Amino acid sequence: MAGTTRDAIDTRFENEYGKYNFIDTAGIRRQSKVDDKIEKYSVLRAHMAVERADVCLLVIDATEGVTDQDEKIAGIAHEAGKAVIIVVNKWDLPETEDKDTVKYSKKVYEALSYMTYAPIIYVSALTGQRVVKIFEQINYVFNQSKMRVSTGMLNDVLNEAITRVQPPSDKGRRLKVYYMTQASVAPPTFVLFCNSAALFHFSYQRYIENCLRDTFGFKGTPIKLIIRQRSEEDETKL
């Protein structure tokens, strides 16, 4: 099937903002047609393209809003830990229902509730309106995804977060978070050592993530938290 219109297409591009390799992927059709062999191939190619990318541009048609296909592609990028920019195209067209970017952004984030870290840019590919902003954001979110934070600064944030909101408990046993360190970048990945992984509920993990974002930014990139359980005896030996 190589050479079909469903292949991802690489385009090298250079401007005053830097050198880029754009990987233009074919769209994913509606579920009723996804059994078609070519469409299955396009889905596979989308996965492969996302894996190769440093930054993913999720292009949304302003006249349609977030479609099922958009949600699928967003999910692929999020699960792959890629930096993401949401690009709302055709913002210049009169049939765009709501020209209020604040309201429109709210609708987008409601549909993609796990991707509120991604910035939204409103553009017109036809007129070139605000297209240059895309390159500024590409560089910005790429750098955010590569950010490293010292262990000392991380644990200052962690201790403040624990003081502000007490860790959860169950049946008389309370979660103790000993310390946190950064393991890798793209996406920024942090390891938190605690006395009980079972007590480290998703809601408290989200709280810690929000504290990290409030302090350091990490705009445009998912954050991965790895929970490691250690006994209190192990911590005493450290």
Model regions: which residues?
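C-terminal-of-GTPase-core extension/linker across diverse P-loop GTPases
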Residues: 1-23, 31-44, 48, 52-58, ...
